[in-house]
Swiss-Prot record:
Protein name listed in UniProt: Macro domain-containing protein lin2902
Stored SUPFAM superfamilies: Macro domain-like
SMART domains for the chain: A1pp
InterPro entries to which the protein is assigned, alphabetical: Macro_dom (IPR002589), Macro_dom-like (IPR043472)
Homology family: Belongs to the MacroD-type family.
Organism, scientific name: Listeria innocua serovar 6a (strain ATCC BAA-680 / CLIP 11262)
Gene3D superfamilies: Leucine Aminopeptidase, subunit E, domain 1
Domain Macro as annotated: residue spans: 1-175
Extent of the signal sequence: none
Amino acid sequence: MDITVVKGDITEQNVDVIVNAANPGLLGGGGVDGAIHQAAGPDLLKECQEVINRIGSCPAGEAVITSAGDLKAHFIIHAVGPIWKDGEHQEANKLASCYWKALDLAAGKDLTSIAFPNISTGVYGFPKKLAAEVALYTVRKWAEEEYDSSIKEVRFVCFDEENLTLYNKLINSEVV
């Protein structure tokens, strides 16, 4: 599996599925969540409302998949990252679960490429370096366990220079 890092707009990625850093209500909001909902069009909100009507809410660490509306991608996986409190409330485990469950959902649909944003590092306040370490470790661990998966490319789409630098540094190290 190839793991790449780019700086850019996740809504413009030409991959099978993009991951949305969603809130528990899946109703859009600020940051990447709002950008994805706006770019995908009104049908996405309708589909998300149907999902929430069925499941109630999507708690931190969980993920659901929907169609992608007007995006280049075919699907959107809505992963609800944890709000950072102090690191003593399972935040890292919940963040890892977002990545793991997103990969499971993508593989379950035999998709080959997936793009992740920097989940929980915006208004949710997760420390960027720790979030990058969790993301890369989890993706690599998943790839080891699911070596015969359909997924051939994982792309991290960074929204700022700080995340881009962190990911590039970590991706080239053996620490993660």
